[in-house]
Amino acid sequence: LYGPPGVGKTSLGKSIAESMKRKYVRMSLGGLHDESEIRGHRRTYIGAMPGRIIKNIQKAGSSNPVFILDEIDKVTQNTINGDPASALLEVLDPEQNFAFHDNYLDMDYDLSKVLFVATANDINAIPKPLLDRMELIEVSGYITEEKVEIAKRHLLPKELSNTGLDITHPKFKFTKAAFEKLIESYTRESGVRQLEKQINKLLRKLAYKQAVDNELAYESVDPTKLEQLLGNPPFYRDIYQGNDY
């Protein structure tokens, strides 16, 4: 799964696990530079332990989990401690992964039942041999209307719960215009990561006012109230946005 940050690639992997009723496990590959982190250390080394693949399989408690390889494009190649990308070839290649060898266990382990889902921002940074062993699915960025629905259905309820505000308050409203202004004037991204942070920031300010005044500070959040709470917007919608030139 490849696409810009914040578009839900990792969340999509978790949803795949839920829909298949399989265990879910995630392994971040960002900054991985040592092959032994994949294959494990031989027992002759002090502090030796199994590789992260086997440790995560153990953590899942299942031989057929959905295994997320997060940020596979960030793996370091050709280091003095071995090439992690080459070790991942054995993990992902169906011709080899039925007998994946972990140095600590000193035995082969069958990974063929595992569903590996890799995520990346830039597929050009992934070594070609690895890329050839994966099916590529692009996860594109969201348009404003999609972000509004994501914020309304998922982000706002989640952050309301996190900040302890009364989510059942009958008069509390977050207008569509406020969502649109938040998206277009306070964030500039393909995904919704910064949008979630801005919603959290806004609700923390409301929670503080509620704690001080013992009542919900604003019954309705509109674009004007938005500026009062978050200050002047750092971005402005492009004048020609939406035009055909």
Spans of features found by a protein language model:
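C-terminal engagement/docking regions of AAA+ P-loop ATPases
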Residues: 193, 197-245
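Conserved catalytic/switch belt of AAA+ P-loop NTPases
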Residues: 69-109, 113
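Conserved C-terminal "switch" segment of AAA+ ATPases
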Residues: 61, 122-132, 136-197, 205-218
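Walker A/P-loop
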Residues: 1-29, 58-59, 89, 93
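AAA+/P-loop NTPase substrate/partner-engagement loops
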Residues: 18-49, 56, 76, 146
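AAA+/SF3 P-loop NTPase mechanochemical coupling elements
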Residues: 60-68, 100-120, 170-173, 219-221
